[in-house]
């Protein structure tokens, strides 16, 4: 085994560790907000009662130790 192979293994191990960290973070988010898709659907239904909408986008961000839920509602033109 050459010196380059030794470092290559660490590189792939680091990539695997990073992928696992991302997978765990996504799993934690789904556990924190398990009903996010249902909430999006209900928000669309309520807004549709009063106006015509194209789309609703819901994103979750984290700033420091605070979770931010951002809701963007795209309305149809002419209303």
From Swiss-Prot:
Protein family per UniProt: Belongs to the MinE family.
The processes (GO biological process) annotated in the record are: cell division; regulation of division septum assembly
Give me the segments passing through the membrane.
Answer: none
Name of the molecule in the record:
Cell division topological specificity factor
Extract the Pfam families matched here: MinE (PF03776)
Record's function text: Prevents the cell division inhibition by proteins MinC and MinD at internal division sites while permitting inhibition at polar sites. This ensures cell division at the proper site by restricting the formation of a division septum at the midpoint of the long axis of the cell.
Q: Which cysteines are joined by disulfide bonds?
A: none
- In its keyword annotation, does this UniProt entry include Cytoplasm? no
- Record keyword Cell cycle present: yes
**Which keywords, in A-to-Z order, does the entry hold?**
Cell cycle, Cell division
